[in-house]
């Protein structure tokens, strides 16, 4: 096998005919400025070609489901292995996806609980035993005399297929009837054809009996036959009543409860046999929230105190006003009384209605007053009913403004049926086990006391679970729990989970391509991550890691520095070799930082607070230990601490959601805390995260920053536009008129691939230009609107230099290092770091109020050291305007540049959630309890 991967003539995106040789079975780092072409080379060239070759090796039948994969723009690649990409973008937002299911640990857990778990009665909690035939008969004979019953033997339960053989065997056994999918079928008279792809339940009718005192012997024979046929389970179908289930295996005689066979699917919240029926296995329910319906009880009904009625209650001709007027007359209350001062009975009546009563409502329609006798179901019930009945997405979205997620009242968030939760192992059910931290779970399993028989049964299962838990600990995720929803994980956490899963698979000879695995990881945990990456390499794999972390670069076998600049100014190999080679390469910006020629300077002065602050009192969400935290205003404050110490909980779940609820009436519930003081000191809160600036290719930097409005105005003021009567709307690709109607102004056509990701292809009519021919005939300085959208920010700053309104907004994009981005670049093609900097640029271009609080969660994701330097300057500019920046960060260059640090810890998970230190970087660096301080000391 070749010892190198040879890339010849790569031209994907901004790559400039790149030739590169990468050593195989080594740990290789790709680095360079944000937008220099690292991802284009790693993901869009190497990974894409590896995937394409793999797909081409499949049969034509398999390929038809995967679609045609385009060949990357590269002359050739030699020595390429099958490629696996572990990036940060593929986190599942499906509420059914958890850490346990993603890592497949939950599958092994289900098997473990099914094989060695102890079943208990879900009602009384007693450990349940097997039932004898005599016990079953005694229970049946308690039914009233002359009750008609059928003895059924369940043969197939919820399985797909035509089940022809099963039905034939029932007939051969001499049974003439069967209950199929709940319906009794006469097998002699009807030919049964079942749909192959649907799930079916088949139960043979063994006997039909009328309860009498002398049927004991016959009943015993029938039950024994049924038990034999169905492997220990019998169903007594009481005509016109509910079935009674008996099991030779597990039943509580006291409560009369029998449990079906304990199989792995009983513990699956995605299976109809295991999931909680009330919440459908989600653990939460979206319900109308009284606090969102009435956020301010000091307002009266006529003042809009009840939000869903706020727009219609002031219109005296509306139905809402008419019915409320009738209610106020009948129950003697005023619509001008503050809601909080209404009698409890009136308050409840408005929300939950009046049962069994009708009220006389006078309603004006078309100038005529009409009297109705009408029921009133209450606002909460009306909203719930409309939400369930409507097919309108607009209506659903509107009602969802008054809804919030709450724990399911039946399963209390556990997602499973009571029968599943009644099975324990070491005194814990499967949900209680999953709620422990991964480190605690590993300890629990190592201390588990099992009988010799159960040890033999569970030996292999436990090995699989324990090894996977250990891999998660190795990548710094010991603080997570298996019940955590995958959608709530950060990009870095999700990526490291997939990394741990890959180590568990022990593949050899694979090309792994990773996207910044160090994101979200404290310096303390970085060594373990690097050791894990080396372990993956030592198995016999090639690792290409797109990374900016200095420790990772120093640990790599080979570094490829791509640049020298970003976008149009990048796409070349600046340096390639070991650490020493890169450090000695003159043109390498990375090398200059590694060798110390360039560095991020420590601020000469640190700001003092403006004397005002925001204080979070008694924060106790997740692992926070009832802490009080004061955030000084007018400063740049960093929130630090090891992974899982409570940073995101404190800032995103409590501070941001709490302030957003107060300032913007957000429907999101903040995490548990007593109160937030000092809210009057700010007027705006903005969370500048790395989520996309838009969900579709229709959104782009020009539309997001608002610069496109000015550009459209310029085009509408040209002589040609005035002659044709074109207004600014003519140059919008979102409305009819000037856009290409074939692609509705997208420039591309979306092809839905059903169970695969959607595929986008260029529009054949406008050739991707978005506009129709007439619109493109209008030019400003010899450029049409499509050509403007194709310009980079850098080109457009010069192009619009005489129009301050446009130039100033574009200049802020230049200031944040996005000169290489095209104005019309679809948001779907922007990295998280680029999206975040576009949001920062948009904020910089606005007039500062001096009372804005900015929150950023790990803004250095995807940024080179030089980009980080620029980011710090932007944050300092925002704070210089009197605003406040609160930043969650592990990057020591950002931390050393802050005015204040709030350090949480000391550990992650249950051992975290305390404030370890508050102060300047210099003060934190001498705090002996602070891991952050230990690493920070070397930087100051």
UniProtKB/Swiss-Prot annotation:
A GO term from the CC aspect: excinuclease repair complex
Organism from which the protein derives: Clostridium tetani (strain Massachusetts / E88)
Protein transport is among the record's keywords: no
Protein name according to UniProt: UvrABC system protein A
Primary role: The UvrABC repair system catalyzes the recognition and processing of DNA lesions. UvrA is an ATPase and a DNA-binding protein. A damage recognition complex composed of 2 UvrA and 2 UvrB subunits scans DNA for abnormalities. When the presence of a lesion has been verified by UvrB, the UvrA molecules dissociate.
Pfam families per UniProt: UvrA_DNA-bind, UvrA_inter
Underlying gene: uvrA
Compartments where located: Cytoplasm
Binding site for ATP: 32-39, 641-648
One GO MF term: zinc ion binding
Family, per entry: Belongs to the ABC transporter superfamily. UvrA family.
Gene3D superfamilies: ABC transporter ATPase domain-like, ABC transporter ATPase like domain, ATP-grasp fold, A domain, P-loop containing nucleotide triphosphate hydrolases
UniProt keywords, alphabetically: ATP-binding, Cytoplasm, DNA damage, DNA excision, DNA repair, DNA-binding, Excision nuclease, Metal-binding, Nucleotide-binding, Repeat, SOS response, Zinc, Zinc-finger
Zinc fingers typed C4-type, residue spans: 252-279, 740-766
Domain of life according to the entry: Bacteria
Quaternary structure, from the entry: Forms a heterotetramer with UvrB during the search for lesions.
Domain (ABC transporter) ranges: 309-589, 609-937
């Amino acid at each position: 096998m070749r010892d190198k991967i040879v890339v010849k003539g790569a031209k994907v995106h901004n790559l400039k005919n790149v030739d590169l040789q990468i050593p195989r079975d080594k740990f290789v780092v790709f680095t360079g400025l944000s937008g220099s072409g690292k991802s284009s080379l790693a993901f869009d060239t190497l990974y894409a070609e590896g995937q394409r070759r793999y797909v081409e090796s499949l049969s034509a039948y398999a390929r038809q489901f995967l679609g045609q994969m385009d060949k990357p723009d590269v002359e050739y690649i030699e020595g390429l292995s099958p490629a696996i990409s572990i990036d940060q973008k593929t986190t599942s937002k499906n509420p059914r996806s958890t850490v346990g299911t993603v890592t497949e640990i939950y599958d092994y857990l289900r098997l473990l609980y099914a094989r060695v778990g102890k079943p208990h009665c879900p009602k009384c909690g007693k450990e349940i035993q097997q039932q004898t035939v005599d016990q079953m008969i005694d229970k049946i004979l308690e039914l009233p005399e002359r009750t008609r019953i059928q003895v059924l033997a369940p043969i197939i339960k919820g399985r797909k297929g035509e089940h022809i053989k099963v039905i034939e065997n029932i007939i051969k056994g001499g049974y003439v009837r069967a209950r199929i999918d709940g319906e009794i079928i006469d097998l002699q008279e009807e030919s049964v054809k079942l749909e192959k792809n649907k799930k079916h339940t088949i139960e043979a009718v063994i006997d039909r009996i009328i309860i009498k005192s002398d049927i004991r012997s016959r009943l015993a024979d029938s039950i024994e036959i049924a038990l034999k046929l169905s492997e220990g389970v019998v169903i007594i179908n009481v005509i016109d009543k509910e079935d009674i289930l008996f099991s030779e295996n597990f039943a509580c005689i006291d409560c009369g409860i029998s449990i079906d066979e304990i199989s792995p699917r009983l513990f699956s919240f995605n299976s109809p046999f295991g999931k909680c029926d009330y919440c459908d296995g989600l653990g939460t329910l979206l319900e109308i929230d009284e606090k969102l319906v009435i956020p301010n009880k000091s307002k009266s009904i006529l003042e809009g105190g009840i939000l869903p009625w706020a727009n219609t209650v002031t219109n005296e001709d509306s139905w809402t006003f008419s019915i409320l007027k009738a209610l106020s007359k009948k129950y003697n209350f005023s619509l001008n009384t503050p809601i909080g001062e209404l009698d409890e009975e009136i308050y409840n009546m408005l929300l939950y209605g009046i049962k069994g009563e009708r009220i006389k409502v006078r309603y004006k329609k078309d100038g005529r007053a009409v009297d109705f006798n009408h029921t009133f179901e209450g606002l909460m019930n009306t909203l719930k009913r409309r939400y369930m009945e409507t097919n309108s997405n607009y209506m659903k979205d509107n009602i969802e403004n008054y809804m919030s997620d709450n724990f399911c009242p039946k399963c209390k968030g556990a997602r499973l049926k009571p029968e599943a939760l009644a099975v324990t192992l070491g005194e814990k059910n499967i949900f209680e086990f999953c709620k422990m931290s991964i480190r605690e779970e590993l300890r629990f399993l190592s201390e588990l006391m099992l009988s010799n028989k159960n040890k033999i049964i569970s030996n292999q299962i436990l090995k699989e679970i324990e090894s996977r838990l250990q891999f998660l600990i190795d990548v710094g995720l010991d603080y997570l729990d298996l019940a955590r929803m995958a959608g709530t994980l950060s990009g870095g956490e999700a990526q490291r989970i997939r990394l741990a899963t890959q180590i568990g698979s022990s593949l050899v000879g694979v090309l792994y391509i990773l996207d910044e695995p160090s994101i979200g990881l404290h310096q303390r945990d970085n060594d373990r991550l690097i050791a894990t990456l080396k372990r993956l390499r030592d198995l016999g794999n090639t690792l290409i890691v797109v990374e900016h972390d200095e420790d990772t670069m120093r640990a790599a076998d080979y570094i490829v520095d791509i640049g020298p600049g970003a976008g149009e100014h990048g796409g070349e190999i600046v340096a390639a070799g070991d650490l020493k080679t890169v450090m000695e390469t003159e043109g390498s910006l990375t090398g200059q930082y590694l060798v110390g020629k360039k560095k991020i300077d420590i601020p000469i002065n640190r700001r003092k607070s403006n004397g005002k602050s925001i204080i979070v009192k008694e924060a106790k969400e997740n692992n926070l230990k009832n802490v009080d935290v004061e955030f000084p205003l007018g400063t740049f404050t960093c929130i630090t601490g090891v992974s899982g110490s409570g940073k995101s909980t404190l800032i995103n779940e409590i501070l941001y959601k709490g302030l957003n609820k107060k300032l913007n009436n957000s429907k999101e519930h903040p995490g548990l805390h007593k109160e937030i003081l000092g809210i009057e000191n700010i007027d705006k809160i903005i969370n500048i995260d790395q989520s996309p600036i838009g969900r579709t290719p229709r959104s782009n930097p020009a539309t997001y920053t608002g610069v496109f409005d000015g550009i459209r105005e310029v085009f509408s003021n040209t002589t040609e536009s005035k002659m044709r009567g074109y207004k600014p709307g003519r140059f919008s690709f979102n409305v009819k008129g000037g856009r290409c109607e074939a692609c509705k102004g997208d420039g591309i056509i979306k092809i839905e691939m059903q169970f695969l990701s959607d595929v986008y292809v260029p529009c054949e009519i406008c050739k991707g230009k978005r506009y129709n021919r007439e619109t493109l005939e209008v030019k400003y300085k010899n450029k049409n609107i499509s050509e403007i959208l194709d310009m980079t920010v850098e080109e457009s700053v010069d192009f619009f230099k005489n129009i301050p309104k446009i130039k100033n907004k574009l200049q802020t994009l230049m200031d944040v290092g996005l000169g290489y981005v095209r104005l019309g670049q679809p948001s779907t093609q922007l990295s998280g770091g680029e999206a975040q900097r576009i949001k920062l640029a948009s904020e910089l271009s606005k007039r500062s109020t001096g009372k804005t609080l900015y929150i950023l969660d790990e803004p250095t994701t995807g940024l080179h050291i030089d980009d980080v330097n620029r980011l710090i300057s932007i944050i300092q500019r925002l704070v210089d305007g009197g605003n406040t920046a609160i930043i969650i960060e592990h990057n020591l260059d950002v931390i050393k540049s802050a005015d204040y640090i709030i350090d949480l810890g000391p550990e992650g998970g249950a051992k975290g959630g305390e404030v370890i230190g508050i102060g300047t970087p210099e003060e934190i660096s001498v705090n002996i309890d602070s891991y952050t301080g230990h690493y920070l000391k070397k930087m100051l």
